[in-house]
Every structure is written in C-alpha cells, then in structure tokens.
Amino acid sequence: MMDVLMYLFETYIHSDVELNVEQEKLEDELLKAGFHQEAVYKALDWLEDLARLQDTDEHARVATGTSTSMRIYTQQEIDGINTVCRGFLLFLEQIKVLTSETREMVIEQVMALETDELSLDDLKWVVLMVLFNVPGQESAYTQMEELLYTSDVGLTH
C-alpha cells in the first residue's frame, strides 16, 4: 500500500497535477501501473481517512498539551512503530515540524497502514502526506520535505 501512496503523492499531489480524476479511472490507472487491487483500495481508503482527519476536531483536544508533555505509546503502537521511528517523531516535535495534533494524525495514519515493518523512509512519507493535508502547515511541510530528501537528518548519538 505504501508504494501506491507514494506513487499517488508524487504523481498527482506533489507535482501540482490537478486531481480531478474519477475514483474508478484512478483505480484503473493504478491497476494498469501494476499495483495490486487490494493495495489500491487500501491506499484510496487511507487517503480518504486522511482527508477526513483535517475536517474534524477529533485531534483538537490533543493540541492542548504543553511543550513538556510526553507521548506515551500504547502497546499496539509500540508494536507497529519501532524505536527509531518513535524517536524520529519526537525529533520532529522538538524542531517544531510536528505539533501534538499533527503527531497524533501521523500516528493514526501509520497505524492504519497495517504494515509489519515501518521503515523510517515510510514514516517520513506519511508525515509529509499528513502535513500536506493540514491547512497552515506549509512551513512544516517545507521542512519535512527537506528532511525527506536528505539522508542525514541530524539524528546522531
């Protein structure tokens, strides 16, 4: 599913191509591009869920946390998001790319991927897609885009 999402993002969203394609035509195009039908459906559902997140106040209550608040992950989140990725999310909060609200959106979208092994690169793409879909996050999106295309993100030990 991640391959389909990245393809859609790079082809339509990131390249400023107008996405006025009917879902059926888009599905056909993705199938012709070689993606499996199940992955296509899951990716389109994932994007619909992401769009729905920006239209709700579901995560607004999270934004009231203070800058000294620490996110405690559930066991399911720990199982789905490895230590490196959780550390990267914390790093993004510390450098103000993510707010507590956008972090929660990212975590929700990552968990919706239903992947066995989330890579750091996949996480970066999810963060970029979330920030792209949240109004007022243009600066954070630009910062994240720079982090995505650079291999050394300053995570030294």
Swiss-Prot record:
Coiled coil: none annotated. PANTHER family: PROTEIN SMG. NCBIfam families: PRK03430.1. Belongs to the Smg family. This is Protein Smg homolog.
